[in-house]
Amino acid sequence: STIIKPDEGEVNIAGYDLKKNSLNCKKNIGVVTQEIALYNEFSAYDNLLFWGSMYKIPGKELKERIDETLDLFGLTDRKNDKVKTYSGGMKRRINIGTALLHRPKILFMDEPTVGIDPQSRNLIFEVIEKLHKGGMTIVYTTHYMEEAERLCNRIGIIDNGKIIAQGTLDEL
């Protein structure tokens, strides 16, 4: 996700070399952290507005993308409520939404369904499947093998920081 500089090999993101053009690489990456990265005193709408402005999305376009995001995650009716009143699953959905506002080509997701209700989990799965069908590359970390089986067309198993196996589900 460009936080740590590579020490060997090559990384190209959306046609940009990470070492030579990290800014354009970053513009094409979305990151969903395991910890919720929202302001509890803000509404969902205001959180999306804040993060969208950080991506420098112009006003009218940003408002349209916020409305699309709220609709995608089924939170339009609660858009003006403070995030602190949301369930864990609702917070997760908005958290993912903040990483999608700038329409990245690659999305890194770290344990996006930890500790949430089944309805939110299924909605997140549906969104991930829709994004993938739309051409987005998703790097998904999980400890839940059934999630990897459902969502991933390639799987890597990491132990002590090293990839010990990788391939399709059938290959593994």
List each model region and its residues.
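Conserved ABC ATPase "signature" region
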Residues: 49, 53, 60-78
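Conserved catalytic motifs of ABC-family nucleotide-binding domains
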Residues: 103
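Conserved ABC transporter NBD signature motif
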Residues: 9-17, 25
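ABC ATPase "signature
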Residues: 166-167
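Catalytic Walker B motif of ABC-type/P-loop ATPase nucleotide-binding domains
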Residues: 107-110
